[in-house]
Regions:
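Glycine-rich flexible loops
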Residues: 1-147
Length: 147
């Protein structure tokens, strides 16, 4: 598989940082939790923020390049423990080039109720039937591919 050009890689990293800032600005941040990732089409590696930084704090030079096993390929900062959310989605779906995981206040509160969520907007009806999806298999960190 052909490696992306330096210009493509630079643009992807810049867009990831900007997307993270927008997520933070829109209330998606939760201290240092929450992360987004991006990869060039057809690649087995992706860019993600390191642990210890909020969505609003990251800069291009902070980003890590990880492989689908969750190993850091490029970068020196510690990898986020939930890297497997991104690697497993990208492994299962080669067509997916970006993954976002956040802890927005209102969706988190509603998801914690443990009841089906009713679609109250036209956009939400895309998910019905059967229900607006939510992950409820664990409340722990996703710290391995098996989780």
């Amino acid at each position: 598989m052909k490696k992306p050009s330096a210009a493509t890689e630079k643009a992807l990293k810049r867009r990831l940082v900007e997307a993270s800032w927008i997520l933070a600005m829109e209330g998606q941040g939760d201290l240092v939790w929450g992360h987004a990732s991006v990869r060039a089409p057809g690649q087995d590696t992706f860019w993600i923020k390191p642990t210890g930084l909020g969505l609003d704090e990251i800069r291009v030079e902070d980003l890590l390049l990880c492989d689908l096993e969750g190993r850091v390929v490029r970068g020196t900062k510690p990898r986020h423990i939930e890297v497997y959310i991104h690697s497993e989605v990208m492994r299962a779906r080669p067509d997916v080039c970006a993954v976002v995981h956040t802890h927005a206040l209102h969706p988190t509160v509603f998801a914690s109720l443990g009841v089906p969520l009713a679609p109250v907007t036209h956009e939400a009806t895309v998910f019905v039937p059967p229900d607006i999806p939510r992950f409820d298999e664990t409340t722990d960190l996703i710290n391995s591919p098996e989780r």
